[in-house]
Regions:
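ATP-binding N-terminal substructure of ATP-dependent carboxylate-amine bond-forming enzymes
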Residues: 1-105
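Residues that mark the start of a beta-strand
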Residues: 2-6, 160, 215
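ATP-dependent carboxylate activation and anion-phosphoryl transfer catalytic cores
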Residues: 8, 72, 248-352
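Short, charged, surface-exposed secondary-structure boundary motifs
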Residues: 43-45, 61-63, 108-116, 171, ...
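Active-site nucleotide/adenylate-binding loops and adjacent lid/helix of ATP-dependent enzymes
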Residues: 109-213
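Short, glycine/acidic-enriched loop or turn micro-motifs at the edges of active sites
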Residues: 167, 221, 294
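Phosphate-binding site of ATP-dependent enzymes
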Residues: 187-266, 270, 281-282, 286-288
Length: 352
């Protein structure tokens, strides 16, 4: 049976996941659908069928998703955009027979989407005597004076600080507070940088009486790891693969017992199904949580060099299939290069 699978507004690296799903060990056939507002989206090259989707959000976008699934007889939907809202309306998709690769617990999805709420939840659990992972020192602020107070409090403890939105994805809004960012030498000798001085940040934040919740927290200066996880429908963890981010584009698949324990504790507590990603970073030898992403991560294809086809196994588990849990190949060091991709010359895609 050929299955129609749809990816909506993903990262460009979803191209790799499409390849892995298509080239699966069970020889399961798929027709891959892809949508994005940008007609030059690179992953359209990997799709059998592609459409330009509307640049909408919220309930309007949810309705688009439901209509698209109905019109194209979608069997499997792998959402990125509006995945929290989609999770909260899963019954509407299931009523059409559509399997959705998303955590079915809408409240848990909303919790993970809010970094401050997730931090608080983990802190409360840590206090029970069964710690999951260390949380960085942080404060949540929504006005300039609160930012100033939090900055003075945390710097008095000797911490370098950074800021990031409570609700956001990737590195959007992330800044390292460094007063050297206002110097002439920094201007002349530094390319694109996430650094911003306290004075500049404070001046910007003063432009509004209130702004969306922002976290100010200790900057973690050690190695960063992404732990890509595969779990069953009930949240039972099958595989966890720690991926170390080295200098530049160097990545290492590392057997790290401490991080594997964190992955198991997270899975035991929150029961996140199918596929998720835990990001941690070290400071003074302690791994501290950055965030949890209840979806395939942008760098999952690197983790799959451990000889585990996580995207396909996640789909198979979603469909109720059983998997033979493979043993990851640790010790892989990898990098990646830019590769030119010729887009279809003069092609015009149909709007969905």
């Amino acid at each position: 049976m050929v299955l129609n699978i749809w990816f909506n507004r993903w990262f460009s690296t979803v191209s790799h996941y499409m390849d892995m799903i298509r080239n699966n060990p069970d020889q399961q056939a798929f027709v891959i659908y892809g949508t994005h507002p940008n007609p030059d989206t690179v992953y359209f090259k990997k799709c059998d069928v592609s459409f330009i989707e509307p640049d909408s959000k919220g309930e309007e976008y949810l309705q688009f998703c439901l209509d698209f699934c109905r019109q194209h007889n979608i069997d499997i939907f792998v959402p990125r955009k509006e995945n929290v809202l989609i999770s909260q309306n899963l019954a509407s998709f299931e009523a059409m027979g559509v399997k959705v690769l998303v955590c079915p617990d809408g409240e848990l999805m909303a919790l993970m989407d809010n970094k401050a709420a997730m931090y608080k939840s983990i802190e409360e659990h840590n206090e029970t005597g069964h710690p999951i992972v260390t949380i960085p020192t942080y404060r949540v602020i929504n006005n300039a004076e609160a930012f100033k107070d939090a900055y003075q409090e945390l710097t008095s403890e000797g911490s370098r600080l950074c800021i990031k939105p409570v609700v956001g994805e990737g590195a959007s809004g992330f800044r390292i507070i460094d007063d050297k960012a206002d110097s002439i030498s920094f201007l002349f000798n530094t390319a694109t940088s996430p650094k911003i001085s306290f004075a500049t940040a404070y001046k910007i934040l003063q432009k509004q009486v209130h702004f969306p919740d922002l976290m100010i927290l200790e900057y973690l200066d050690g190695y960063e790891y992404s732990i890509d996880c595969l779990a069953g429908a009930d949240g039972t963890l099958h595989i966890a693969i720690p991926r170390k981010k080295g200098k530049g584009r160097i990545r290492e698949i590392e057997y790290n017992e401490e991080l594997l324990v964190i992955a198991h504790r997270m899975a035991d507590q929150y029961k996140i199904p199918f596929v998720f990603n835990i990001q941690v970073k070290y400071k003074d030898g302690v791994a501290k949580l950055l965030e949890i992403n209840p979806r395939m991560s942008g760098g999952l294809h690197i983790s799959c060099l451990a000889s585990v086809n996580i995207p396909y196994y996640a789909i198979k588990l979603l469909l109720g299939g059983a998997i033979e849990v493979p043993r990851p190949t640790y010790g892989v060091k990898a990098t990646y290069i830019e590769q030119p991709v010729i887009l279809s010359k003069g092609s015009v895609l149909t709007k969905a």
